[in-house]
Amino acid sequence: MVHHITSNDELQKLLSSTTYVVVDFFADWCPPCKAIAPVYEQLSTKHSVPDVLAFAKVNVDHVQDAAQQYGITAMPTFMFFKEGKQVAVNGQAVIKGADPRTLGAAAEKLGGLAQKRVAGA
């Protein structure tokens, strides 16, 4: 399940209440954003773990303060967070552009970490 974020406060609450979060900063008018949206939905369905790994979408035109806070200059931009702090996954803290292979690999990595956390490892 993808969390559709409507305010920066809502984003901050998700970041503080969930161990790992993948955030997709997008715009409705952005063709690459539309192209990767189904992939992002599939990754969310496959890897989401309640309170451990969440996938969120932030529309940069509607939640401008969040876009500014994280320095979003291109869409889509994907960022990864652990315990509220931005982190690198597979050596990348940010993925700019619709790159399904890199995004999929990052989701797989976080999904594995989330499963280990649930298992108590």
UniProtKB/Swiss-Prot annotation:
Looking at the record, the residues that make up the Thioredoxin domain are: 2-112
**Signal peptide start-end:** none
What are the entry keywords?
Allergen, Disulfide bond, Electron transport, Redox-active center, Transport
* InterPro entries noted in UniProt: Thioredoxin-like_sf (IPR036249), Thioredoxin_CS (IPR017937), Thioredoxin_domain (IPR013766)
UniProt key word Acyltransferase: no
List the cysteine pairs that form cystine.
30-33
Query: Which SUPFAM superfamilies does this entry report, sorted A to Z?
Result: Thioredoxin-like
Transferase: is it a keyword of this entry? no
Membership in a protein family: Belongs to the thioredoxin family.
Its biological purpose: Participates in various redox reactions through the reversible oxidation of its active center dithiol to a disulfide and catalyzes dithiol-disulfide exchange reactions.
Name of the protein in question: Thioredoxin-like protein
